[in-house]
Structure formats: structure tokens, C-alpha cells
Amino acid sequence: MPPLRGFSDNPFSDKGDVIVATTALVQALEPYFSPGQARVRLPIYSGAHFDEVAADLEGFARPIWAIAAVFAESATTTDPTLQTYAERLVSGLANGVDPGHPEYWGAIDDWDQRMVEAEAISFALLLAPKTFYEPLSAHSRSHLVEWLSGLNGKVMPKNNWRWFRIFANLALHRVCGVPYEDVKHFIWEDFALLDTFQLDNGWAADGPWRKDATDGEEAYGRQADYYSGSFAIQFSQLLYTIFAADLDPGRVSRYIHQAREFAGQFWRYFDKDGAPIPFGRSLTYRFAMGAFYAAFALAGAYDSSSPYTSPGFVKGMLLRHLRWWATHSDNVFALDGTLTIGYLYPNMFMCEDYNSPQSPYWAMKSFVMLALASNDELWQADELPHPLAAIEETKSLESGVKLLSAPFQILCDHPDGQHHFMISGGQFCVWPLKATQAKYSKFAYSSAFGFSVPTGLLLTQIAPDSTLAISGDDGETWVTR
């Protein structure tokens, strides 16, 4: 698998470097736009559990996280590739929400994947309305309101998805002119559920947190993973502080406080070189693991009273992570330069049933800080080193070990062994996803070694790393924990 020029050789040291990476990533997608620009379909098939139109919408919407950020300051850019790409998106948006167009995305139904992509579209409308809303005709604007309003009243999972509807309603009000009173009750209904996910120290679970084995909690798991931080909840909370400061000042203040608390612990999910600890589901989103720091910077949530919330620290955490992916991307991209389903190499065993070929482009959430001007304090600050770099100088094992009580984990760094790992004994996922036991319930996870997922029932197929495996019939069958 070839590296991708512009990403794999990228030093990721400043804003210009991130723009170069964005250009490289979206340029590979250009041949796969539909004639009406509303769909992007890569020339492979994964059998995701939703329809192909929704999968094509993923390909259209997910790069918007970066493209909208590029156009936050101005409706034009000097990069011709990104300018053309944005124009494609505007045309595609108009056609995708038009029920009379052949490339209509379809109305949003219960449990619909379209809900997920509505957040990225709403983000673009909120952040860069001059680029993504003002060019639309009155006819297209009406269709857009109808399509986004389709989330309201629909059944959604009890997890991070509720944020997608909140952002759709924010865009309806802030950009499309829908009165706040018409959407406020939908927003507050979703907040009533999301508030129940909150744990200690800024953490939030990705769904109701099972406290014990009492009746009535059988449908609940214990999941506090990258969805809690970078993929969804903390990420969306921070973006909410940007777009709802006057509408909901109390909640905005609370979310900023929680983000600062979370920042004091989340850095331990990464080693001193920026390598993340692979844990939980949806790892095919790859460098979206660092998106918490991109959103933190965009929200300007800095606090000089903590060493973990300064511009230099946030910049270091984010850019080190992107550099790590750049230097480990030789097998991440397909021959045409598009992202593959997998982690450090294409891997369908560890993917989810909701991963279409276009799904990996959620990785571009880590580029939302491109909305910040070149003279912003993030770009002007010097990168600060990872705290563990200083710890290793002292050769102090104890200072590299920390109990994170909220997610039931102990984060460890062994300076002599140069090993960064997590001991995790209390999380589990009850949703019927692929290999959830391997993704949540092993005893340990490491930034140096990917964990194995079972491919069959034989011991060699189970590959029980960080797992207790017991056989009562001379190896015919195995029970694992």
C-alpha cells in the first residue's frame, strides 16, 4: 500500500501543513463524486448495515469537518483544489436535500445513518454560512430546512447520536431562520438524556452507564472510550460552546469546565510520540482520536491555571498525534489514495457493521482547528512536550501511573520498558457489535501493540492477548475473560 503524498510526508508543524494534508485527503475523493455532486462512493463494497445512499452521503459529508473549517474566515481560498471541492459540496448540498433530484439523500427515518451526517452538514452551515448557505437558492434553503427538520420526532439510539439532532436544530435556528421556540424543546429533550451520561472529572459515557446488576439495567453497558472524548461527546460539547453561548450560557460554562477537567486526564491515552492507545469501537476513524484537542483549540477553552490546557500543550498533543499517523501511514491508504477500513493496515475483522468504505473520513474531525486564523494563539504557540517526556527523564515509574476512576482504568507508562499502556477492568459493551469483548473487556491495551480480535473459535483464532482463556475439554472450546 503506498503512502499518500501530502499526508504521509507531512511534518504537521503549522496550519499550512494541515491544509496540505486536507488537500491530499480530499483530492483522492474527487473522482468518486456523482454527477450531481451529492454523493461520494469509493469503488469497493463493505456491506454496511445501512443503505447505499446513506453510505454515499458519508463520503459527501465527512470531509466537510475540514473543508468548512478552511472556509470559516472567508468564502474563498487560494488553494484551487479546496475551492473547487467546496463548490462541489454546495452543489451537492442543494441536490441532496431536493426530493425532486435524482441524487436526493432521502428523508430521515428512525435509527437512520443520515442523522450522523447531518451534524457535519450543520457544522458547515454554522461555521461557514457564507460558503455553504448563502449561495443556496430560496428553493434549496426550503428543502434544507425540511431535510434537517426530519431528525425531530424520530427514534434515535441512547448515545452520542443525540448531539447530531442538537446541531441540526442549532443550524435550523442560527442559519436557516427557524424560530428558537420551534426547536428548543427538541434540544432540551436530548439534553435531558445526555446529562445522564455525565461521569466524574469531565468524563461522559457513550450512553447510560450501568451502575450495578440491578433489574432494569440489562440494556446498559459501561463505555467511556474515544466517543467520550474525541469522536463525539466532548468534541460536540466544545463546538456547542461556540454556537450557543448566548442561548445557553449556563451549560456552555459547564461544558468548558468539564473539557478542562477532561484534558487533565485524557492526555494519558497517548504516549510521548503521539501514539494513541487503541481501545473501544470505531478505531477505523484513526486520527479522529485527537479531535478533542482540535475542538478544544477551536473553542478557545484554554486555562492558564492548568499545565494541560494551555495553547502550547494542546498544540503539542494534537500535532504529535497527527505526526504519528503520518509516519505510520504506509499501509493506511488504498492505491488511489483513499482511506481504507482498518487501523494501521486494512482490516475487516476489527471493523464495525456500520463501516462503509466512506466511513473512515470521520478522521477529518481532527482538522476543525483550521477555522482558526494563522495569527491565533494555537498556531503562534510553541509546542510543549508530552508530560511523559519529562517523567522519563526522572525514571520514576510511580509518576507515570494514574488511576482514572471515571472510566475504570489505570493508565501506565513504564519509562525503562518504553511502554505506554492501559489496565482496564470495568468496561463492557452490550450492543451487538463485532468483537466488543475484545474491544472493551481485555485486561490491558497498549499504544505499542494492537489488540487481537477473534476470527474463529480455535485458540489460534481467538489469540487471547491480555485475556484469560480456559478450556475444559482439552482445547476443543474456550471460555475467555
Language-model segments: residues:
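A structure-centric feature marking long, well-folded core domains of fungal metabolic enzymes
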Residues: I19, T23-F33, H49-E52, P63, ...
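Acidic, serine/threonine- and proline-rich low-complexity regulatory regions
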Residues: Y45-H49, G106-A107, D273-F279, Y345-E352
